[in-house]
C-alpha cells in the first residue's frame, strides 16, 4: 500500500539485521515502493550485502504494520456497523412503544369522553332500543329517563297482572262449559240408546241404497268401456293386417339391403387388404434396394479411404526423406546424387507397386504375360463398355417403370382411400337406417303385443259378461242358436255383438219394471244376508214360510253364485298387472337372446 501513513511508519521503524526477508504478494505488487527499492539497489554498490538485508527487513516490518492497521480499521468498521444496527433497532423499538402509548392515550381519551357524556349516551342507547319513547326521553337526564321507564314498567306489570286474572277467569269458565258439554253428551247418548233400533234400520237402508247406486254406476262404466273397446278394436282390425304386411315387407327389404351392404363391405375390406399387401411389398423392395446402394457406397468409401491413406503414407515417407536430404547442407554433390538415387528408387518402388497390383489383378507373374494380358483385355473392355451401355439403358427403363408403378400406387392409394371412405359412409348410413327400422319394428312389435293383451283382456271380460248373461235368451238374432268358435278371428266381435244384444234386452225389460221397488228388494236381501253372515256357528236358524212371490230376476242362490264368480276391481287389476309383467319378462329374454 502507498498511503502516507504507511510511509511514515516505514520511516520511523527501526529494523534489526537478523530478520529474514519475507516480502508478501501485496508488497511486491506496490509499484512506487518497488521502483524506489530498485532505484536504491541500483545506486548501491554490489559489495554491500548487509544494507540489502536491512532494507528487506524494514520492508517486511512496514508491511506487517500496514496489515495490522488494516485489521484494526476493519474491526473499527465492524464495531461501527454493529453500533449503527443496534441504534436503529432501539429507535424502531422506541417508535413502536411511542405508537402503542399514543393508541392507549386515544383510548383513554375516548373513555374519558364517554364518562363525561354518560347521561346522553345512556339516553341515546335507550332511544335507539325503544324508538317509541323518543319524544318522552329526548330532553331528560339519566335519572329522569330511569324514573319514566320505571313508571312504564309498573304500568306494564299491572296490565300483565290484569291479563293473568282474566286468563284464570276464562279457564274457570271453560271448565264449566266442558262440564256442561259432558252432561249434554250423556243426555244425547241416552236419547240415542232409545232410538238405536230405528237408527240401525236407517243406516242399513242407506248402505244398501248406496251399494245399489254404486253397482249401477259400475255397470254403466263397464258398458261404456266395452263400447269404447269395441270401436277401437273395429278400427284396429281394419288397418292392422295391412300395416303388419307393409312392416314385414319393409323389414325384409331392409334385411336384403343389409346383406348386400355386408357383401360390399367385405369386398372393400378385401381390396384394402390387397392394396396394403402390395404397398408393403413395394416398401420392402425399396428398403432392400436402398440398403444395397448404401452398402455399395460404404464399400466404395472404404476403398477410397484406404487408397488415400496409402498415398498419404507414401507422401509422408518421401517428404521425410526429402527433409533429411535437405538437412545436409555441407555435401551438395552427395545430396544431388542422393536425390537422383531416391527418385530412381521411388520410380522403381512405384513401378513395383503398380506391377504388384497388376499381378494381383491379372494373376500373372511375368511381365510379357502381363503385356499379353493387357492386349487381350482390349476386346474385353469393348464388351464391358457395351454391357455397361445396355445395363444403363435397362436401368433407365427400370427407373421409368418404377416411377410409373409409384404413380399408380399413389393413385391407387388415394382412390382406394376415397372408395373406402365412401363405402364406410354408406355403411354407416345403412347401419343408421337399419337401427331405425329395427327400432320401428320393435315399437310395432310392442304395440302388437299391447293390442294382443288388450284383445285377450277384452275376450276374458266378454266371456265373463256372457257367462253372467247366460240366462238371457235371444230369439230373433243370427247368432242366437249358433255356438261361437273360440279359435276363430271373429270370436271377440261376435261375442261382443251377443253381449250387446243381451244388455239391450235387459235394458228393455228393466224399463217395464219398477226400479225403486227392485232396489228396495235388493237392499232387503243384502241386509238379511249380512245378518246371516254375522250369526255364530252354533246358532240354528228357523226358516219361516215366505208369503211373497219370488222375483224371477233376483234369485237368492243364483245371485250368491254370481257374487262368487264376479271379479272385483282389485283382482282384475292384479291379473292384468301379472299378465303385463309376464309379457315384459318374455320380451326381455327374447332381446337378450
UniProtKB/Swiss-Prot annotation:
Any one GO BP annotation for this protein: determination of heart left/right asymmetry
Disruption phenotype: Mice have a spectrum of laterality defects, including complex congenital heart defects associated with heterotaxy, and airway epithelia show largely immotile cilia with loss of the outer dynein arms.
Residue segments, region Disordered: 10-50
GO cellular component, one term: cilium
InterPro entries linked: ODAD1_CC, ODAD3
Organism superkingdom: Eukaryota
Compartments where found: Cytoplasm, Cytoskeleton, Cilium axoneme; Cytoplasm, Cytoskeleton, Cilium basal body; Cytoplasm, Cytoskeleton, Microtubule organizing center, Centrosome, Centriole
Coiled coil: 84-317, 378-449
Comp. bias (Basic residues): 28-37
Primary location class: cytoplasm
Key words, A-Z: Cell projection, Cilium, Cilium biogenesis/degradation, Coiled coil, Cytoplasm, Cytoskeleton
Reported function: Component of the outer dynein arm-docking complex (ODA-DC) that mediates outer dynein arms (ODA) binding onto the doublet microtubule. Involved in mediating assembly of both ODAs and their axonemal docking complex onto ciliary microtubules. May be required for motile cilia function.
Subunit structure comment from the entry: Component of the outer dynein arm-docking complex along with ODAD1, ODAD2, ODAD4 and CLXN. Interacts with ODAD1. Interacts with PIERCE1 and PIERCE2; the interactions link the outer dynein arms docking complex (ODA-DC) to the internal microtubule inner proteins (MIP) in cilium axoneme.
Stated name of the protein: Outer dynein arm-docking complex subunit 3
Recorded name of the encoding gene: ODAD3
